Amino acid sequence: MTDCSRCAGTNTSGPNHWPERIRDIVDFPKPGIVFKDITPLLSDGPDFASALDEMAQPWRTTPLDAVLGIEARGFILGAALARELRTGFVPVRKPGKLPGRTLIQEYALEYGTDRIEMHEDALPRGARVLIVDDVLATGGTLRAALGLAAQLELEVVGAAVLVELQGLQGRQKWANDVPLLATLSY
């Protein structure tokens, strides 16, 4: 059971109250960090549906072949958004989690590097995709997903995140010619 003395948030529910379902967890995953926890939102069907509807709205008339969802919570939002938009879903995973041949993109962390990958045959060249993740923080992972899409010669029509942490300036790492839409910003 989580120690909710570190949690901030409300239990209000309703069509316009879904942002209140995102709670702050202080000092997680390490001291000094305030983590935006979306799990209360995910567990509330009506509020989750409202959040997904808002995320999907800007893309409803955009022709898409697939949503690329970034591990791990980008899987949850990306798969649900793909269903909402009636298109396919392609997972973007941490290294070693996908069978078969993959494309790999390395990206910088504060101390060191990490990688993400996707199947090299996931989509045909020129497929139109939307990149989805839960949170835009420093922008490294989202930028790496853009790099994977470029390796496969996909057409990235945009990116969608549920939450943007503006103070971390992740948007500055994004491609200026590709729309990046955050449903909620802090």
UniProtKB/Swiss-Prot annotation:
Keyword check for Repeat: no
Pathway membership: Purine metabolism; AMP biosynthesis via salvage pathway; AMP from adenine: step 1/1
Keywords: Cytoplasm, Glycosyltransferase, Purine salvage, Transferase
Major site of localization recorded for this protein: cytoplasm
Record GO cellular component, one term: cytoplasm
Reaction catalysis annotation: AMP + diphosphate = 5-phospho-alpha-D-ribose 1-diphosphate + adenine
InterPro entries cross-referenced by the UniProt entry: Ade_phspho_trans, PRibTrfase_dom, PRTase-like, UPRTase/APRTase
Subcellular location(s) per record: Cytoplasm
Single Gene Ontology MF annotation: adenine phosphoribosyltransferase activity
Coiled-coil parts of chain: none
Group of enzyme by EC: transferase
Quaternary structure (record): Homodimer.
Family: Belongs to the purine/pyrimidine phosphoribosyltransferase family.
NCBIfam families according to UniProt: apt, PRK02304.1-3, PRK02304.1-5
HAMAP family for the chain: Aden_phosphoribosyltr (MF_00004)
Protein name in UniProt: Adenine phosphoribosyltransferase
Organism in which the protein naturally occurs: Xanthomonas axonopodis pv. citri (strain 306)
Organism taxonomic ancestry: Bacteria, Pseudomonadati, Pseudomonadota, Gammaproteobacteria, Lysobacterales
